[in-house]
Amino acid sequence: MAAGVEAAAEVAATEPKMEEESGAPCVPSGNGAPVPKGEERPTQNEKRKEKNIKRGGNRFEPYANPTKRYRAFITNIPFDVKWQSLKDLVKEKVGEVTYVELLMDAEGKSRGCAVVEFKMEESMKKAAEVLNKHSLSGRPLKVKEDPDGEHARRAMQKAGRLGSTVFVANLDYKVGWKKLKEVFSMAGVVVRADILEDKDGKSRGIGTVTFEQSIEAVQAISMFNGQLLFDRPMHVKMDERALPKGDFFPPERPQQLPHGLGGIGMGLGPGGQPIDANHLNKGIGMGNLGPAGMGMEGIGFGINKIGGMEGPFGGGMENMGRFGSGMNMGRINEILSNALKRGEIIAKQGGSGAGGSVPGIERMGPGIDRISGAGMERMGAGLGHGMDRVGSEIERMGLVMDRMGSVERMGSGIERMGPLGLDHMASSIERMGQTMERIGSGVERMGAGMGFGLERMAAPIDRVGQTIERMGSGVERMGPAIERMGLSMDRMVPTGMGAGLERMGPVMDRMATGLERMGANNLERMGLERMGANSLERMGLERMGANSLERMGPAMGPALGAGIERMGLAMGGAGGASFDRTIEMERGNFGGSFAGSFGGAGGHAPGVARKACQIFVRNLPFDFTWKMLKDKFNECGHVLYADIKMENGKSKGCGVVKFESPEVAERACRMMNGMKLSGREIDVRIDRNA
């Protein structure tokens, strides 16, 4: 690898010599006779054109000679001086400036040094003469020519920073810059990829890849060093010689590797990210919601243990046994699960006839007879005891829901809920439909048993009604927040539910034939009339009223589903802990992890950057308006917002552009960074402060 670097240096050193030789008055011809300079020039120009075509193609190159960068390194800058003020000073004293970058520390504070790039070599030399020892806010500036970036590199090494460019050797000769960029894009955002070529425009088997961040360059070394590309092992290391534009990190960049640390291995989190153990058990408010947030598995945790369906919403009926010892639901779960499984197996084997082909379901009747007696009565008592606790908790829940301003952000995550689970639901319900056609005869026997049990539930339900009266005021206070949830859930329907619901249509028709066999006679035998008006009137439903229920709307299902598991435990007497963390919600932890992680695999833990949709553009022409900025960046994608930063009614030469998605913002950075507008090369990057 050292030989490859030295060879690259030799090419860079020999190219100027070739130009000097070509500029000599006479050049020897093939037969040894001197040829006048004028006759040789067309041949040299043709060769250069062919060479440029082979090397660059249509790629944009901001510098006429990419091997030369006219930089000046300035130190002893007052710490309160901004890059714009420094640029104005250099422009006033020297002339046109291409690029200015203040070097910052990990906290975003100036280190008192900067890199200034010029378009012409004369400007670089003039800056070293004119600005050196120039007094700025009482401090004499120190200016040095730095065309190879050596002074800036030393300053960055002192700051413990790494470059973002890697050097790749032992490449196959047919690998071009596009293939190199395609491969290394797996490690991060590639700003530029280059293949070093010889004087004939052929690959030398070495190249460089520049990433957006240094950590991506380190990751590329970990991922690709020693890996085969076209049967040749790549040798990847940090490029110590290159310092391309963009290696000077602005304050919004995250902290880089500590000084002296050469690299890091893979963490235990997703994508090799390190895990913060402090956030693993940080569930919020509604039970087992996963680390520091509420993902799809979290919000469906109570629902998916009841459905008997596969996929993210599935998981069988095993969790019904956790509804409290006083409810005897574990026995119901065992009988129903076993019977449904046997019925599904028989249906797949092609058995016909409801009574003869599903003997397990027919045997459910006597079992439910035994369950529905004492078991149902104990269920009512358990409900009465648990609902006393739930009532007070829901009143506290109302206070919490008033603070849930971030619920409006749930829409983007809920849009991802559709495709995540409904396709799995459709296939599972399709199998349930075949089984439901054979359940009818067994359900007839269930009716008699359940009727006896429900008759004995009337008295406990009276006690439940007294508790539900207390829920009315709490539910009314939940109304405004859940109304915002309803608006967000409207966005869920067209996004992901369409395909799943289309598949569910014919399946539901098949389920209907089985449900019809339950009939009115069976329902009449269930003893529901014993619940009567007296019990229902005591439930305080009039307190909930039309206004609250209309605002709650279709959002009640998903909103309450997330808490079903914890509510089940609360009914057994442990519900008091469900909302003991209201202080954390009030301080903002609830909004960030709840709304920000809907539909994902957990929320954004503190310290993990959220992808931004806004970019920051610098070095704009001062006559550039927000309309011109918006029109220009519309080439990359739909622009939601564009603005030029102003001071005293005049442009500061920088602005922001907001896109509809982080992907479009990243594409705009790749496309527009380094582009020239009115002779000024703009600098485009993600606005981390947005």
Swiss-Prot record:
Q: Where is this region: Disordered?
A: 1-63
Q: Name one GO molecular function term.
A: calcium-dependent protein binding
- CDD domains referenced in this protein's UniProt entry, alphabetically: RRM1_hnRNPM, RRM2_hnRNPM, RRM3_hnRNPM
Positions with biased composition (Basic and acidic residues): 37-49
Can you summarize the PTM annotation of this record? Sumoylated.
Q: Is tRNA-binding given among the entry's keywords?
A: no
Q: Where is this region: 27 X 6 AA repeats of [GEVSTPAN]-[ILMV]-[DE]-[RH]-[MLVI]-[GAV]?
A: 360-568
**Bias type Low complexity, positions:** 1-13
Which residues are annotated with the PTM Phosphothreonine?
T625
Keywords in UniProt for this one?
Answer: Acetylation, Isopeptide bond, Methylation, mRNA processing, mRNA splicing, Nucleus, Phosphoprotein, Repeat, Ribonucleoprotein, RNA-binding, Spliceosome, Ubl conjugation
Q: Where are the sequence repeats?
A: 360-365, 367-372, 375-380, 386-391, 393-398, 400-405, 406-411, 413-418, 421-426, 428-433, 435-440, 442-447, 453-458, 460-465, 467-472, 474-479, 481-486, 488-493, 500-505, 507-512, 514-519, 522-527, 528-532, 535-540, 541-545, 548-553, 563-568
Which part of the chain is the RRM domain? 70-148, 164-241, 613-689
Quote the subcellular location field of this record. Answer: Nucleus matrix
* Tissue expression remark: Expressed in all tissues tested, including liver, heart, lung, skeletal muscle, kidney, stomach, large intestine, small intestine, pancreas, spleen, peritoneal macrophage and thyroid.
State a single Pfam family of this protein: HnRNP_M_NLS
**Residues where N6-acetyllysine is found:** K133, K237, K632, K658
Cellular component terms (Gene Ontology): catalytic step 2 spliceosome; cell surface; cytoplasm; glutamatergic synapse; nuclear matrix; nucleoplasm; nucleus; paraspeckles
Instruction: State where the record puts the cross-link Glycyl lysine isopeptide (Lys-Gly) (interchain with G-Cter in SUMO1).
Output: K658
Position of cross-link Glycyl lysine isopeptide (Lys-Gly) (interchain with G-Cter in SUMO2)?
Answer: 17, 37, 68, 82, 87, 126, 133, 142, 144, 181, 237, 245, 305, 341, 348, 611, 627, 645, 652, 658, 676
BP-aspect Gene Ontology terms: alternative mRNA splicing, via spliceosome; cellular response to carcinoembryonic antigen; cellular response to lipopolysaccharide; positive regulation of protein import; positive regulation of protein localization to nucleus; regulation of postsynapse organization
Report the SMART domains cross-referenced here. RRM
Quaternary structure, from the entry: Identified in the spliceosome C complex. Interacts with PPIA/CYPA.
Its function, per the record, reads: Pre-mRNA binding protein, binds avidly to poly(G) and poly(U) RNA homopolymers. Involved in splicing. Acts as a receptor for carcinoembryonic antigen in Kupffer cells, may initiate a series of signaling events leading to tyrosine phosphorylation of proteins and induction of IL-1 alpha, IL-6, IL-10 and tumor necrosis factor alpha cytokines.
Q: What is this protein called?
A: Heterogeneous nuclear ribonucleoprotein M
